[in-house]
């Protein structure tokens, strides 16, 4: 198994209410930056050979230094991100394509992960890598705890309520066979078409491609709002007590 990981860490974190210049991926949980926990999981995943990170230009030196000092030897490059998350991932994909042309080595799968999800586990990464190779695409998800409702034609009122048993909340890392993800991003760039995640690109440009569900627990949270920090600390402490 040869998987390459892309970690998207370019978000400006508006909902975190951070001061200018601050980055949510560099906020600390248990004494280490959020992104440190994230990278470590991929460093320890046996299926992952190489890691690419996309971040804001001003954060590149800090992440390069952190990866070097922590011994994260799988980190091949820290790349400047783009305006949107999709642009950041695409920048990494272009770097991967260049490496393929240079070395002649094509990875089996590419995994795309949010840098602000620090609690993904190495064994989960390996499972998603394996299922991505087997089925072509695999995306982790959790069952929603709350009822979800559509907004009605009048945006001040609810519309219908979808059946909750048929809904899942999608997470990352999202895994794809290498050529599939590269082609999806190439086509999206040609059409200037944007989606909120990589699975949506595959759904649009390769509708015949099934995407395997990898159902997991509720630990794989994304650090998005200030309230997520104490929750993240609690998750870390609970997991530390299990070790």
Name every feature range the model reports, one short phrase each.
Residues 16, 63-67, 128, 148, ...:
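Hydrophobic packing residues within well-ordered alpha-helices of enzyme cores
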């Amino acid at each position: 198994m040869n998987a390459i990981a892309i970690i998207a860490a370019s978000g400006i974190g508006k909902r975190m209410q951070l001061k200018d210049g601050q980055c949510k991926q560099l906020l600390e949980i248990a004494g280490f930056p959020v992104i440190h926990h994230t990278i470590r999981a991929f460093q320890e995943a046996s299926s992952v050979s190489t890691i690419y990170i996309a971040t804001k230009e001003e954060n590149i030196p800090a992440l390069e230094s952190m990866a070097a000092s922590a011994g994260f030897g799988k980190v091949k490059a820290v790349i400047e991100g783009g305006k949107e998350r999709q642009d950041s991932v695409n920048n990494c994909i272009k770097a991967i394509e260049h490496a393929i042309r240079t070395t002649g080595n094509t990875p089996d799968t590419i995994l795309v992960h949010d840098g602000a999800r620090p609690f993904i586990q190495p064994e989960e990464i390996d499972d998603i890598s394996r299922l991505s190779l087997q089925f072509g695409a695999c995306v982790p998800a959790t069952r929603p705890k709350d009822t979800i409702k559509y907004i009605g034609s009048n945006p001040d009122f609810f519309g219908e309520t979808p059946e909750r048993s048929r809904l899942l909340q999608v997470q990352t890392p999202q895994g794809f066979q290498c050529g599939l993800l590269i082609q999806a991003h190439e086509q999206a760039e040609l059409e200037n078409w944007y989606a909120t995640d990589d699975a949506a690109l595959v759904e649009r440009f390769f509708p015949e491609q099934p995407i395997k569900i990898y159902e997991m627990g509720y630990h794989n949270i994304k650090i998005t709002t200030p309230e997520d920090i104490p929750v993240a600390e609690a998750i870390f402490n609970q997991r530390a007590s299990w070790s």
